[in-house]
From Swiss-Prot:
This is Protein sds23. PANTHER family: AMP-ACTIVATED PROTEIN KINASE, GAMMA REGULATORY SUBUNIT, CBS DOMAIN-CONTAINING PROTEIN. The keyword Cytoplasm applies. Belongs to the SDS23 family. Residues 106-171, 197-256, 274-331, 360-419 form the CBS domain. Keywords: CBS domain, Cytoplasm, Nucleus, Repeat. It is found in: Cytoplasm; Nucleus. One of its GO terms (molecular function) is protein serine/threonine phosphatase inhibitor activity. It comes from Neosartorya fischeri (strain ATCC 1020 / DSM 3700 / CBS 544.65 / FGSC A1164 / JCM 1740 / NRRL 181 / WB 181) (Aspergillus fischerianus). The keyword Cell inner membrane does not apply. Residues 21-40, 422-432 have a biased composition (Low complexity). One of its GO terms (biological process) is cellular response to glucose starvation. Pfam families: CBS.
Length: 538
């Protein structure tokens, strides 16, 4: 009777459509009908399972069977021989490079002048704000000649002195005391007083009419930059040419210089260039130690390695710009790894770059690949690493070591190169590859008052999480074990020798810079001089 009423309700629906009515609480179907329905549902479920299982065994996409556009050999050839830029300056096309004058490479916009009486704070501001690699020092604004330079190596030397981390030699002690007196009296400290603290590379000048062969020979001997002067106008400065600019010029116009162009396809291990004496520092060491090493050794950058000599970072004197504010002083007593995270954060926030500051090649890299990477990254040196060495293949790396390692990588990855004796420290735990190393932005730390209380800056700043130690960084996955370094000097020295020139020995130039270093490492604490420099506030 109930079923009949339901059928009548469907028939009386105004649309004439079959709309199912709610089923009553008591199912009126017979047991046989219900069991048949269950069997049908079960059969449908089995059919759906079989269909889903058949999808799992579906044939692969045709893309997987498509041949790659480039073979592995073609890709490797492209890496070994990257194409030079096509926008070559037509002014140099078809010309013999020996007839091109160095004056044609200068740009007047590169000139940034300060005077001998300019204060260290003003000079620091000018150096950083202008984004210039070096400032030229002249006697007065009316003079057109240069008497010296002020760059980040000079700033690093003064920073260490201001923080009380270096002590001048005996012959400069009187100048040091005079600086301390001026700082106590809050007088301006002029550059002419500061320059005595850092006897860096002497000023080198070349006439604008000198050809590129003279420049290549000069730079190949270890000179990093030359001041170009007008010899017909009382030595007036017309520009600055650096090693990087010359290497970049020769790379972009290499096809016009066959003597140089034939070197680019060759491998580093066959050319025999680069230094096997590499100075590095463990990432867990304090930043001030890295700055002291660069100052005392006369180098502009230092490799940061983990406990197995894997390169995990790079610190250069240019990075000192991040330490010129009073709030940044505690970074000096934090780890090198932490400072690398600060460098990364500054690059991301200020320059919009997202890159890890490790620039490296290996002994099987071609000269073309090496120079192209230098030009692209604007690096003055690239670390030579052994990419085949596992992170556990070597003993713990000393905190500061100058090791003699072969430039060419060994084919046996289990054989470790000779290194200096391990540091007398306990072994750190194995790297934890599951823990990411994310850079943290720079944090404001303390005010300038901490200068007079050095102990207050030793601890971890409030609100800053400790950085991941170097022992936990996956250095081997990033680069490999450090086995050498190749610099702009090495490349230009090679170009000079290939051209039949006789450049000076770069090793002798490095030795002169070490001998001329006017500072010796000390733990003397003095905050008086620092007030002048660290008055740059956030």
């Amino acid at each position: 009777m109930a079923d009949l009423q339901n059928l009548e309700a469907v028939a009386d629906h105004p649309n004439g459509s079959a709309i199912a009515s709610p089923r009553s609480s008591t199912d009126s179907r017979s047991p046989s009908t219900r069991s048949q329905s269950l069997r049908l549902n079960h059969s449908n479920h089995q059919h759906r399972q079989s269909f889903s299982e058949s999808l799992r065994a579906a044939p692969g996409s045709p893309r997987t069977r498509r041949q790659p556009s480039f073979t592995q050999a073609a890709i490797q050839s492209l890496i070994d021989n990257p194409p030079a830029p096509k926008d070559v300056n037509p002014a140099f096309a078809g010309r013999d490079w020996r007839e091109i004058s160095i004056g044609e490479l200068v740009r007047p916009d590169d000139l940034r002048f300060v005077e001998l009486d300019t204060g260290i704070e003003e000079a620091t501001n000018t150096l950083i704000d202008s984004d210039a690699p070096v400032l030229l020092i002249r006697e007065t604004p009316e003079h057109k000649t240069a008497v010296g330079t002020f760059d980040y190596s000079d700033l690093n030397a003064y920073l260490l002195l201001a923080a009380g981390l270096t002590q001048p030699n005996e012959e400069l002690r009187e100048s040091y005391e005079e600086l301390a007196r001026k700082a106590r009296d809050e007088h301006k400290i002029p550059l002419k007083d500061v320059k005595e603290l850092s006897r860096s590379e002497p000023l080198t000048t070349l006439p604008a009419s000198a050809n590129l062969m003279t420049a290549v020979e000069t730079f190949g001997g270890g000179v990093h930059r030359v001041v170009v002067v007008d010899e017909h106008n009382n030595g007036e400065v017309v520009g600055i040419v650096s090693q990087f600019r010359l290497v970049k010029f020769l790379w972009e116009n290499g096809r016009s210089f066959p003597v140089i162009d034939q070197l680019y396809p060759q491998y580093l291990r066959d050319l025999g260039i680069g230094s096997r004496e590499v100075i590095s520092i463990n990432g867990d060491k304090q930043l001030c130690e890295a700055l002291q090493i660069m100052n005392s050794e006369g180098i502009s950058s230092i490799a940061v390695v983990d406990n197995h000599s894997n390169v995990v970072g790079n610190i250069s004197t240019t990075d000192v710009k991040l330490l010129t504010r009073s709030s940044s002083l505690p970074l000096l007593h934090n780890t090198c790894i932490h400072f690398i995270s600060v460098i990364l954060s500054a690059r991301g926030l200020i320059e919009g770059k997202d890159s890890f500051p490790v620039f490296y090649v290996n002994p099987s890299s071609t000269l073309a690949h090496t120079v192209a990477k230098m030009v692209a990254t604007k690096s003055h040196r690239l670390w030579v690493t052994d990419p085949l060495s596992p992170s556990s293949s070597g003993p713990p790396t000393p905190s500061h070591s100058s090791v003699q390692l072969p430039l060419a990588a060994s084919t046996n990855s289990t054989q470790s190169p000779p290194v200096s004796p391990p540091a007398t420290t306990t072994n750190l735990p194995a790297p934890n590859y599951s823990t990411p190393h994310l850079p943290s932005p720079p944090q404001p730390f303390m005010n300038a008052a901490s200068l007079t209380h050095p102990a207050a800056s030793v601890g971890m700043p409030h609100g800053v999480a400790p950085s991941i130690p170097a022992s936990a960084l996956p250095g081997a996955r990033l680069s490999g074990r450090l086995v050498g370094v190749v610099s702009l000097t090495d490349i230009l020295n090679l170009h000079a020798r290939a051209s039949g020139l006789s450049p000076a020995d770069p090793a002798e130039s490095r030795s002169r810079r070490r001998r001329s270093s006017s500072s010796s490492v000390s733990v003397r604490k003095s905050g008086d001089i620092g007030r002048e420099l660290f008055s740059r506030r956030d």
